[in-house]
Structure formats: C-alpha cells, structure tokens
C-alpha cells in the first residue's frame, strides 16, 4: 500500500534513523525520544551511538548505518555536507522510499580550523543533496535552522520556538511536521527546496543569518514570512 501524508502523520509508531551523533544528532535524538518517537542511531564511531542510545532508554537503539537506514521510515543525516554526499552515494538503493531529512549547512572547517562556506553564494546544500537522492526518496530540509546550542536548549519553551523546513514533497512535509512537533518546536514551512537557501547559514530565516542570533516563535515567523512574500 502506498503511504500517504495522512497515514504517516497518524501512525502511532514511526522509526527515525539519525546518522551522526555530534551536537545536532544528539540534540535531535534526545528531543524525539522525550517526545515519544522511536530512534535508531548510527555513527562512524559505533560506540558513541551505542552510549547515547543507552542514555536515552527503550525508545532508542544503535546499529550500523546500513541497518539503521533499512529499519527506518525517516533518515536524518546529522553530518557535514561532504560526508552526507558520500553516505548517499554508498546507500542510494536503501534510501528509495525513505523520508530523508537534511539539516546540513554549506560550511566546513578549513585548513586553519576556521568555518568557511563550501558552496557558491545562492546555492544551498539542500538543493545539492536533493539532486543526489534517488527519485523515490522524499526529501526535506529541516533541523538545521538553529545553532546546535539553541537546538538543544530551546525545545518545549513557551511560546514554542519555530523550526523552519523546506520541501516539495507532501509525505516529507507530514513526517517532518510530526517530528518537529514531537521535538518540542513549532514547524513552519519556508517553501519548496528552492527556499532551502533561506533556512541555511546566512539565509534570511537562519539564526545565524537574517535572524541575527534570534530564536523566533510562530507569530514572529508569520510576520517574517509575510514580509518576504
């Protein structure tokens, strides 16, 4: 049976694979488990994924990248963009039919350990990643609009902080709205994949871009979206 956005939002149990357990992956995993979602963790260093799963309890487990993708309905790659591109190339067939969540930003550490942009101005990592995925994957750009510290600390505040997302896929939209809500944030769609550049670093809707370090709520996000339309 073909999955629909309605069935995925209503399903009682959904499994999210989180590939990478650095600051972003760890924060998302913790928030999702606290929100009642099941996660399966994988990382280059499997012992770190196993240790985090043990901390998070019965809704979390750890395994290999290949098994995590296979078991999951949703796959979130919490890794640097270059690593993400390699992982897609290695696991293309397994990603068919999966909702793929990309929180990456077009940045990396240079030879001096400084953070530098890795793509030309105006090009988003979201558009790059979407172009590498198989046609059967359901792509969404999300969980990368806040810095790692804010992502970890701003969940479930009052009023709720917003996480923007971008997708052209209804199934991916339903899944990410469920996950963002479970993680303790309000989901707000910025647009299709062509809007990904707005929610990445230096973009108009990114904390370290047009928001000038601010974390916004739904009312503020609505005003920002209206100003941009």
Regions found by a protein language model. Name each.
Residues 41, 76, 165:
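Conserved SAM-binding loop
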Residues 57-60, 65-113:
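Rossmann-like NAD(P)-binding element
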Residues 55, 63, 124, 131-139, ...:
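Internal alpha-helical scaffold of NAD(P)-dependent oxidoreductase catalytic cores
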Residues 2-58:
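NAD(P)+-binding Rossmann beta1-loop-alpha1 motif at the extreme N-terminus of oxidoreductases
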């Amino acid at each position: 049976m073909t999955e629909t956005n309605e069935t995925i939002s209503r399903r009682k149990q959904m499994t999210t694979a989180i590939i990478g357990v650095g600051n972003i992956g760890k924060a998302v995993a913790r928030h999702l488990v606290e929100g009642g979602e099941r996660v399966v963790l994988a990382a280059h260093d499997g012992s770190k994924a196993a240790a985090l799963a043990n901390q998070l309890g019965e809704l979390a487990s750890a395994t290999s990248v290949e098994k995590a993708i296979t078991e999951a309905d949703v796959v979130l790659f919490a890794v640097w963009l270059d690593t993400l591109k390699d992982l897609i190339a290695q696991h293309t067939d397994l990603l068919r039919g999966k909702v793929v969540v990309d929180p990456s930003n077009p940045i990396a550490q240079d030879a001096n350990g400084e953070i530098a942009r890795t793509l030309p101005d105006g090009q988003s990592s979201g558009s790059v990643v979407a172009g590498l995925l198989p046609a059967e994957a359901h792509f969404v750009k999300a969980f990368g609009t806040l810095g790692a510290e804010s992502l970890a600390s701003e969940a479930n505040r009052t009023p709720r902080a917003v996480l923007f997302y971008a997708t052209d896929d209804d199934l991916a939209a339903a899944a990410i709205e469920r996950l963002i809500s479970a993680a303790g944030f309000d989901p707000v769609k910025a647009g299709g994949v062509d809007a990904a550049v707005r929610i990445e670093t230096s973009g108009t809707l990114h904390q370290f871009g047009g928001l000038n370090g601010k974390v916004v709520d739904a009312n503020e996000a609505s005003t920002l979206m209206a100003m941009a339309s």
